[in-house]
Amino acid sequence: MKYPPEPFRIKTVEAIARTTDWERLAVIQDAGYNVFNIPAEKIYIDLLTDSGTSAMSDNQWAGMMKGDESYAGSKNYFHFETMINKIFGFKHVIPTHQGRVAENLLFSTILKDRKGLVIPNNNHFDTTRANVEYNGGKAEDLVIDIAKDTQAIDDFKGNIDLDKLAHLIDKVGAKNIPIGMLTITNNSGGGQPVSMANIRGTAELLHKHDIPFYIDACRFAENAYFIKTREDGYQEKSILEIANEMFSYADGCTMSAKKDALVNMGG
């Protein structure tokens, strides 16, 4: 596969401090061998942070300087709303500072005074699971079995198992499932993509039982790319066209904009 030169220039760099073997040993000992206690400036290669670290364009930085800070009626909100509608097709938009806040808004609303309800997903991301359980719900992971085999090759290892989903609905009852979800791509499942057929099938099964279908859309563009390159019938479609179809099956979504929107904050 040939890769063209990047169509951009990098104008700003951030220095990263290097450490010696002995310095790293001292740091990990001081942290009690808990990597979450290590100061970030002591980390040379960060394999944990998965978002909010991409370089932003000159137009993005300029846009921050021209930002409308009006308490209501901000022109930036209307631009944000327009872009959400163009990509996702949803009329109602609530901006948040990151995805986990959007999750808490959703689950604190649908689970309020209704403890013990079940939220199925292919795999819940850790903040999604935390927000479900903090608000009294039960998070159920129903990813296909092959996803757990690291040596197996499959185009869409992020798919939800529709048989497991159907069994769960029969077991707990549709009235005890306020929404069903898909995370695209499947972050806690190794970032594996979800096929359009699986998205469509999930929507059809949930809607058959009058259960709303929501998408955790953090990496929707990457998922659309995998659909374009791996799923029959989508090679000639644009990423936007594929994204439009993905979300046409959903009743709503949450998203951290710190991933595929390539910004350092937002949701």
Where are the predicted features?
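Conserved PLP-enzyme active-site core in the AAT-like
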Residues: 2-33, 37-39, 43-56, 60, ...
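Short, contiguous pre-domain boundary segments
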Residues: 63-65
